[in-house]
Amino acid sequence: MISVHTRLKVIDNSGGKEIMCIRVLGTNRKYATLGDVIIGVVKNAVPNMPVKKSDVVRAVVVRIKKTINRKNFFSVRFDDNAAVIIGSDGNPKGTRIFGPVARELRDKNFSKIASLAQEVV
């Protein structure tokens, strides 16, 4: 579960390396889980890229460390907390996504992110 001040790894090629969550979007929500949109500030960035350090961006949570229990009695857990930076229209800013992402993104209408990913778990 992602709360305020949690740092997440950015797994696309938009230019950010790490973001810190400053707000979970929704009505009075404390935690974000897979497929939730957060607002974050870029803490580390690659030089000469569109996303700069200290930019305020929207991102979708695509991996969390907490165990996810699915309805088919499987449970999935990732090694890190990761996000993909998106624009105001909901499409990713990067053109590539590195590493696996969760299947729950398709259910939450982020099929563009799921189709760009190397692996959907």
UniProtKB/Swiss-Prot annotation:
One of its GO terms (molecular function) is structural constituent of ribosome. It is found in: Plastid, Chloroplast. Keywords: Chloroplast, Plastid, Ribonucleoprotein, Ribosomal protein, RNA-binding, rRNA-binding. One of its GO terms (biological process) is translation. SUPFAM superfamilies: Ribosomal protein L14. InterPro entries: Ribosomal_uL14, Ribosomal_uL14_bac-type, Ribosomal_uL14_sf. The keyword Translocase does not apply. Its main location: plastid. Part of the 50S ribosomal subunit. Belongs to the universal ribosomal protein uL14 family. Binds to 23S rRNA. This is Large ribosomal subunit protein uL14c. It comes from Cyanidium caldarium. The gene is rpl14.
